[in-house]
Amino acid sequence: MRDRYPGSPDQSSVASVGFALAALPIAVKNAWVEEDVARSRAEGTLKTFKNLKNYSGFYYHFYSMSTATPSSGSEVSVIDTALFLGGAITAGEFFGGNVKSLANELYERVDWNFFTKTNANGSKQFYMGYNATTDTFSGAWDYYAEQLIMYVLGAGAPKSEYRIDPRMMYDFARNKGTYGDGEPFIYSYFGSIFTYQFSHAFVDFRDKVDENGVNWFENSVNASIAARQYCIDNADKYATYGENSWGLTACDSPSGYNGYLGGQPSGYKNESRQSEGTIAPAGALGSIVFTPEYSIAALRHYYEFDDLRSRYGLRDAFNLANRNWYAEDVIGIDKGITVLMAGNYINDGIVWKYFMQNKNIRKAMDRLGFTEV
């Protein structure tokens, strides 16, 4: 799965592959692809990943599609591996047979403790990246973001020696705030809306609370409503923003890719939020399970712009305040979250159904302390 199109023709994004694998059941259910063809794609992809260079089961962020080797400068990434496994497990449960066997094999070989750091106070967190050349780790998942699926996969590891301490899910900062008169929610560092979506594409957090009583699904509902209101309140500053054009998220922008776009509240200084008028349709569309009415209204609005359409649906982003700028590319992870959330909304939670039926995932939810409400 390419990272983007038409740009970077040789670069594959591991997270995008995960989204693509989980999209195959959606494609089959909607008769977009024959089941045998989809199964063959899934099996071929997993066979390729079985032989890709990895460390303790963790994959690099990017690989060359022509050589199947890590892209230059790419780090080994825990979150991208987790999103890939989310798709692999979903496809495995849907297709069964060799696809399921391969998915289980790839999941089984991941040593989640390899990426774990223990702090002086005894708390544990995942590192963000690993540089195999220097044998050093970088960053830490010490703040709420898109990483919840990592704890689910780590707690459900098929091999007990590779399994994380479930308390890790409670060892990152859970700061709560509000935007305007909205409901409070645990917010992410940059306030980017994708951080409230990615794990939710796979893990069904509906009607569940963790040991601290947090309903993560409702948390994303409140975050999505806040993201929309933020754009409504700033529509006088940025022509792209409005009640049907919202959801600041990492995306292409007139100045290049920007991973820091987001709304309030956020862990970073709110007065320094990067809000430069660019909107990615994936922001609002990725929240369709949280705010269906608002997200569908946004989709209808976006399709009014002829220049925003492309071979693969809506382009990655646009900015009406900057010479009516439209992105040239579509990006794999942005298309991925759009398709998976649409599938969950339209096809009765199809990705949730197959990911959550995996026996290791069910055990993980119990180990992490989730209960039904």
Region annotations inferred by a language model:
Residues M1-V373:
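Ser/Thr/Asn(+Pro)-rich, low-complexity disordered segments
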